[in-house]
Amino acid sequence: MDKAQRIRRYQQLCDELHRHSRLYYTYDRPEITDAEYDRLFRELLELEKAYPELVTAASPSLRVGASPLSQFTPVPHSRPMLSLENALTEDELYDFDARIRKLLASDAPVRYVCELKMDGVAVELVYRDGILSVGSTRGDGTTGEGITENLRTIPSIPLVLSGEAPALLEVRGEVYIDLDDFQKLNHEREEEGLQVFANPRNAAAGSLRQLDSAVTAKRPLKIFCYGIGQLSGEHPASHHSLLKCMHRWGLRVNLEHSRTLEGIEQVTDYFRQLQQRRDELPYEIDGMVVKVDDLALQRELGEKTRTPRWAIACKFPPRQAVTVVEDIVLQVGRTGAITPVAQLKPVEVSGVTVSRASLHNWDEIARLDVLIGDTVVVERAGDVIPDVVKVLTEHRNGQERSVPLPQSCPACGGPVVKLEGEVVPRCQEMSCPARLRESIKHFVARRAMDIDGLGERTIEQLLKRELIKSVADLYHLTKEDLLLCERLADKSAEKLLTAIAASKTRPLGRFLFALGIRHVGEHLASLLARQFGSLDALSHATREELLAIHEIGPQVADSVTDFFAKSRNREILAALQRAGVAPQAEEKRSGGPLTGKSFVFTGSLTRFSRKQAQEMVERLGGRASGSVSKKTDCVVAGEAAGSKLEKARQLNIQILSEEEFLQMIDTLEEA
């Protein structure tokens, strides 16, 4: 085969594979078997391996995944990916319709398009000359994270558009996982000893945020496209026409459940139908999106700061079920906090079997008046987290039992103390096995040291065999140690050891968060890392030095100094250092004209996003905070500013408009 023949055959294979992928994933009309598709794909891979110069940005081989990234890059959206206003009742839906007709000065029924509100992750796909060039998350609506390589691995996202596609097309869609695929994914993770995902949305979000796209490629992700940002050339006249155009271009659109309806009465009827049919769908939805169909009317209605006036999201009410509290067990966390958890007679809520529900603390138990044996109403708040919301006292038979406040730790029998102002008692025993287990789970978590492959089941086995007695022992584990754990094969053990070794040089902020210092979350851990620059400097910081930092109050200052004062913690830190754990130092924030100044942004900002505002302030040495206090130096007020603005006036704090703030920043940067 000469060069010209190779090029022709390669292009032919690309075209054939793209075509069959569209037929299978977008149109559900496969023409060849999976085996035939695999044969074509293998031929393509062999050609690319032999002649790498053939590979293009449109190659179907990109579905497999590319080289891992070190970090995601910011991607600005040419047009904001706006949020939607919510309607929680049918009355609010009628109010929305009344506003639309008032703005249009018309009494005639409005034509609406109704679409399913997928419970997934919003993304943007940018096609240039019909080829997928950039993919990103929604982010804050103005800027997302570049996840192009990950999105290319999703089979239902076309790498190349079909038909007479526009030169530029920005597509908005929702990435999700089918319920059956989600159950299968969690079962596989359980088998591997990995932490399971809480729900399909979390699984989709976690899959998209993988730095290694080969991991994303293994996840059963799908997409439904629902709108556009920019479109070159002629625009369709209506939203439903736009959906049909997108479908013709090879994009996956949920036409099956989209409806074009005349007037709000038809819309509310369809909303009721969806609520009844919700459990029949193969994926999670949390409502219905209603849009004015006429695109010219959409432009006339325009947008508010964060939401379009021409669309609304009708949210389903939380789904509930009635069951029985079979027991109330006590759970010990990494800080020693003892929390009550209701063990329930298994019941299905929102398509998920629920057998446990949080009771939070004994104040909540008293408020609900819940006893062991009670019949209760359980709700998955946001269709995710189970909660007991009501006790049906009329079902009591006198056999119910209360759960007293524990006098000793249920895990180790050690002393328990309930401090003034706190709602839960705490185990005081540092060697408590339950505290150790939870501390290690926190230490290895993705947002902390990110030790992939060290799941809850493996941690339990390592503790049971006494192979680890502190987080420092993780770094002394051998392959032989790991092979003692059930369901941990040779290859998995090697991968886990690699992940443990890679965690030794995590950024200081991540390391501080992993230590589990009480009251120090991700944000404060990052703040302390930037302020002090090294673990040694922070460990020697005085209470006064900590209090001098904005956002650090007495509670956090005491917690940090107490942590480094405890001999057990110093021993663990020394052991981590001996094991080669060396958190990457972060540069101490340099001074600037706003050093020591605290800013609060309130109201609807139109000139910049909150993230951009924070970056401007921090660039000049200042800090952005979320609340107004006596320590606040300046409040920047956007449209419809509320209680924060009022509090600033009461405290006589300087107040700036967005324009005045930008002028101040320009002046300081030019100085």
From Swiss-Prot:
- The enzyme's first-digit EC class, named in words, is ligase
Name the species this protein comes from: Syntrophotalea carbinolica (strain DSM 2380 / NBRC 103641 / GraBd1) (Pelobacter carbinolicus)
Under which name does UniProt file this protein?
DNA ligase
Q: Which GO terms describe its molecular function?
A: DNA binding; DNA ligase (NAD+) activity; metal ion binding
Give the required cofactors: Mg(2+); Mn(2+)
Enumerate the Gene3D superfamilies for this protein: 5' to 3' exonuclease, C-terminal subdomain, 6.20.10.30, BRCT domain, DNA ligase/mRNA capping enzyme, Helix hairpin bin, Nucleic acid-binding proteins
Q: Which family does it belong to?
A: Belongs to the NAD-dependent DNA ligase family. LigA subfamily.
Q: Binding residues for Zn(2+), per the UniProt record? A: C409, C412, C427, C432
